[in-house]
Amino acid sequence: MCYTRGKYGENQFKMSRKKHEHVIKGVLPGSIAEELGIEAGDRLISINENEVGDVFDYHFLVNDEELTLLIEKPDGEEWELEIEKDYEEDLGIEFEQGLMDEYRSCRNKCMFCFIDQMPQGMRKTLYFKDDDSRLSFLQGNYVTLTNMSDQDIERIVNYHLEPINISFHTTNPELRCRMLCNRFAGEALKKADRLYEGGIRMNGQIVLCKGVNDGEELERSIRELTRYIPCLESVSVVPVGLTKYREGLYPLEPFQKEDAKKVLDTIHRWQERIYEEHGIHFIHGGDEWYILAGEELPEEERYDGYLQLENGVGMLRLLKNEFRQAYEAAEGDGRARKLSMATGLLAYPYIREMAKQLREKYPATEIFIYPIRNEFFGELITVSGLITGKDLIAQLRGKELGERLLLPCNMFRSGEEVFLDDITLPELEEALQVKIDIVKSSGQDFIEAVKGI
């Protein structure tokens, strides 16, 4: 690696660039940017004399072995920084705007949209509907393709930014227009053709709505999506989430046990067929289907490397397997402790069974597991990630909580100790009069939290 730095000369490249100055929020320790003296508050003006329009441009331009950065310091002084580095080595720069541009909001009015089912009075950011392909690349968000221009598609292909996660929901163009309440939603499916032709890796999802895109429509969607293999690596099928706030919205019904069995029969039949032909299982059912149907979770190899974890596909199988491995490797009798843990109704039977095994291994440790009903959104919402502080307080106050209460990390806003209803961790500790530990979502972390490691 080689770095050189100099003040920017008057006769060198200059641009009218107000729109494309990107304020730097932070610099990673030990990074190239830190060694060069780049600091929070500096502005990135250009890379190799190219304006940086957004994060797509940035990731494409920094993937080079020789770079020339133009940086403007807070006092207006401009630095030209010449860098020699490994091709894909990151500079270690974090920007105030993660996308280096404005976020794109959703243009659809989906019949199943969860945000439309939220009560009034929550923090403003929770009501923002994103449908931005850049967030798909950066954070794994799913996009409907209705908000993507031909230029966006070409940039993804040319920059080879992948994977792109797509909310298909159905491959029936007319039905897709109706489900998304967007007359362009069917035509937008053709953009997946261009991504496939460009060799871009994709993942897909289908939010299943009873009597709408299930049954024969689901069969059609799976069949037609297989044409994108191998670029389309996986497709999840998850049941629509229904809250109690659906007044004035499309009258969707919750799935029942027999419905779940039929959905899983379809998925399993297609898995066998696709595996024989392509060597992958491709189509995956969300964990909720197996709980609702009363069926055993698939074995690990059926998940093809857990490509759909963020969609709730395979989370319980992974948790069980990680717990078993950590349990078999765990040593010692464990010190005397009295603990509690709260979780959603979906994971409760599995957490309860793990706690039972730990009590057998560590007899001096008492663990109380409490399932939390979602009174805030409604009892059809069973995942722990949508549990609020108010529900925890209402259902745990007066219970035996022991010296520590364990809560899964997905109950909290990313990177913060705040629940969806803005109750903070200290406020919950005060209300319940107990110290709370946040536990990561792995079997190993659960055992370590119980042992107090």
Model-derived features: where do they sit?
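Radical SAM enzyme core and accessory elements
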Residues: 1-17, 23, 294-453
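PDZ-domain C-terminal substructure recognizer with occasional recognition of PDZ-binding tails
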Residues: 9, 59-95
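Short, structured beta-strand/loop micro-motifs enriched in basic residues and often containing a Trp
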Residues: 20-29, 49-52
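Terminal peptide-recognition signature
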Residues: 33, 41-44, 69, 113
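Conserved PDZ fold ligand-binding element
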Residues: 35-53
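Conserved Radical SAM active-site core
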Residues: 76-78, 85-231, 241-270
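Structural preference for beta-strand elements that scaffold enzyme active sites
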Residues: 163-165, 201-203, 234-236, 282-284, ...
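Flexible glycine/acidic-rich beta-alpha junction loops that bind and position SAM and/or redox cofactors
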Residues: 212, 232-258, 278-301, 374-379, ...
